[in-house]
Amino acid sequence: SSAASDVYKRQELYAITCNVGFEGMDFTGVRKFCESINVPYEQVDTEIAKIVFEDNKDERPCSLCAKLRKGAMYKRLGELGINKIAYAHNKDDFIETALMSLIYEGRFYAFPPVTYLPEAGVTVIRPMMYVPEKGVANFVINQGIKVVKNTCPVDGSTKREYAKQLMEQINRENPGTKDRIMPVSYTHLRAHET
């Protein structure tokens, strides 16, 4: 419709990557992809890796790293006057988060598709929340997008990786489990929003 077209035209895209400071992370592919689709791109350089791994020396650094990354991003968004951010969380991320919440927190929670964060003045949207990780991976391959290699020292041995492997095992032994968890998780989430 014309109204939808007008809304779409008013949206401006601006891509930002938070560089946490791990050696060997190369964002050149991200920059080139953004240039190819005419989207401005900026890399926010931080010392988060140093803070998390040298200053704090936490055995499970993911939570602190995530908080610091988000803080750096929200700060930059505020400086730019941007009030929305789209995260690339996919269906598998949603399911893994629900499983992690159940295992480690004793509650059934996962992130909603849209969240307003009043302290940051930012609305978080997750446009790929219903897309399986394999669908995202196939798109990336088909488009020839260069993936940034994660050089975090704990990559592959995190609570999220454990939840991912556990969910894969459960789904192998009980085919369709992933597809059944998503709507239940989302329904539960919606029931607790009100």
Segments and roles (model prediction):
Residues 1-98, 104-107, 134-142:
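ATP-dependent adenylation/nucleotidyltransferase module used to activate substrates
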Residues 8, 187-188:
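Low-complexity, disordered terminal segments
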Residues 11, 94-172:
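Catalytic subdomain that performs nucleotidyl-dependent activation
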Residues 20, 154, 185:
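Glycine-rich beta-alpha junction loops
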Residues 29, 72, 165-166, 180:
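Alpha-helical elements of Rossmann-like donor-binding domains used by nucleotide-donor carbohydrate transfer enzymes
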Residues 68, 131, 176:
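Conserved active-site and cofactor/substrate-binding residues in soluble primary-metabolism enzymes
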Residues 166-185:
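An accessory alpha-helical subdomain
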Residues 191-194:
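A short, hydrophobic C-terminal helix/tail in secreted or cell-surface proteins
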